[in-house]
Amino acid sequence: MVDLRRPDYDRPRVLRHVDLVLPLLTLAVALIGVVMVYSATRGPATDLRPAETFYLGRQARLVALGLVAMVVAGWYGHRRLHRFVPLVYVGMLGLLGAVLATGIEVRGARAWFQVGGLQFQPSEMGKVVLILALATWLGRTEEPSGPRVAVAVLLTAGPVGLIILQPDLGTVLVYGAIAAGMVLVAGVKGRHLFILGLLLVTGLVGVLESDVLEEYQVRRLLVFVDDDAETTASYNLEQAQVAIGNGGLTGRGLFQGTQNNSALVPEQQTDFIFTVVAEETGFVGGAVLLGLVGLLLFRVWRIGQMADDRFGLLVSAGVFSMLLFQVFQSVGMSTGIMPITGIPFPLVSYGGSSLLTTFVSVGLVQSVHMRRHERQGRA
């Protein structure tokens, strides 16, 4: 057994096992994001629009801060965080409750705190907290029992219920993907998976039938079901698909996208950032970006396989599930194969909360890799 109470923190020995591929891939994708955010937001300064380098500078600073956060997370270690999980989980629930009362509303969702000129979305960092909480709980046994799975469901349902009230359907789906991926890797029995599937379907139907979702969110889902629905969401999807089609094989050239420069695609620096990539760099550029993300995902999965305990394995599985679902959903809603739910492309979309969350998550996976020999060292 790994002694989580007194982990061995021999820094020189641990640093010898730093994985260089993981941060290099992460940085490469993030730098592509900086360029794409600049392309999506560039333009002359006016009374209504910041200078053309405003978003570029902010995104670059966020990437630099994210790199620091990734290093700190890897250095501090996932096992040290293990002991604080209950306290941090309760704190997350407190923040999610507080944002409903004191947060600001952005695009119909009360999900952000305003601190000076900065906005902070607690549900983003809550993804990391959920991963740690589920890894702690599910990692205690080789094959989680029914009661243990039930508690895992409750651990997920707590933050999900508060996020639904914001309402933020996209983040709810990400939390669900995290939980689903970790439950599968944890080795939950088939009958328990079946029950979880029924609960998931029932919950989704309940949310859709309730009055919790905003009207614009319902319209987005309606467009996915009915392509002929005449709504703002259908127009947005059409413009996104036109932008992707304009790119062709090699794209129109960096900063030369017609849909982009005409600002016809909504939220193109955040939710629809992939349309900027596809229009300006074409199929080739989109394939390169997705290829880099694929390599990053493969590395996260491989590190999970190398973990020397179930806690590290499940942390890696949670990060893998989070990134995979967000990339698939972000690209899918730009191309029309998935409903529009407002999920950012990890490391590429503009936004500090999402970017920092992803960097911290990768840092935790780095910690798993750095400490994969501790168990053998104490054997």
Residue ranges with predicted function:
Residues 239-241, 254:
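Aromatic-anchored, glycine/proline-accented short structural segments
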Residues 249-281, 307:
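Long extracytoplasmic/lumenal interhelical loops at the membrane interface
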Residues 11-26:
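N-terminal membrane topogenic signal
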Residues 42, 75, 179, 260-264, ...:
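N-terminal low-complexity, intrinsically disordered patches enriched in charged
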Residues 168-173, 252-257, 268-270, 287, ...:
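Transmembrane helix boundary and interhelical junction motifs in multipass membrane proteins
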Residues 23-39, 45-238, 245, 275-335, ...:
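Hydrophobic alpha-helical transmembrane segments of multi-pass inner membrane proteins, especially
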Residues 1-4, 8-9, 326-379:
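A juxtamembrane structural motif centered on a specific transmembrane helix
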